[in-house]
């Protein structure tokens, strides 16, 4: 796997001829602060792909600055290059996100009303739903597939003795929720619901805007973590990259959720920031 980053002071020749620099596991682009135009972005993406093809690699982590170059990253995606973005890890850390909000906002977990927007059941989502249900006052599952989730509702009731609500009422489902955990609803669908105006909405897939004029809450689209062991983070990576991306890339995803959570606990991973469009907590 390679890391892709900007150059602090690219020389004129490198910029003119789009010369990429390779240092160990880092691909350094001949750009600094400027926004890339379409032609240059495509040339850099093509040259990046050639390096990755030679190394038989199709997964990369991009720096914070390169994330601000959508033309370049879109071209990488179009060439089937996987960009690690921390979204898989964000879903894994769903309950820890609830814990973090509870701590920062000084609201006890047992007083929280949480709605979870979800249409697809996975081992990860089931684990987090049960964890949230055990610790929060009220949990609503908002879904278009009520019958599918009724089975899960009965399973949680039988095994944990906890009642959750399965609903798809656009007028009432989200009207009293302190926290809305959006696992997989797209923006168009989410905006059809009546949302509590002071709610904190956590969008696992990111890049969602709430169009309600009366909404005064927070729409979280990104996050950052802290890790106990920072062997993966040399000085350059510590400054230029998001820890969440590097940590996600280190994880083996095809293993039982219990094993994943055991590693997260051992590494003392915790949420340290949640980022909205114009604010953070």
Residue ranges, per PLM feature:
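N-terminal basic/disordered segments at the start of proteins
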Residues: 1-23
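Adenosine-phosphate binding glycine-rich loop
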Residues: 20, 201-281
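Well-ordered, non-membrane alpha-helical segments in soluble/globular domains
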Residues: 38-51, 95-98, 125-129
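Phosphate/diphosphate ligand-binding glycine-rich loop within oxidoreductases
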Residues: 46-92
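Short, charged/polar "capping" segments at the starts of alpha-helices
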Residues: 67-72, 124-125, 146-153, 188-190, ...
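Long, charge-dense
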Residues: 86-105, 142
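Glycine-rich phosphate/diphosphate-binding loop of Rossmann-like nucleotide-binding domains
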Residues: 104-171
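Rossmann-like adenosine-cofactor binding region
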Residues: 162-228
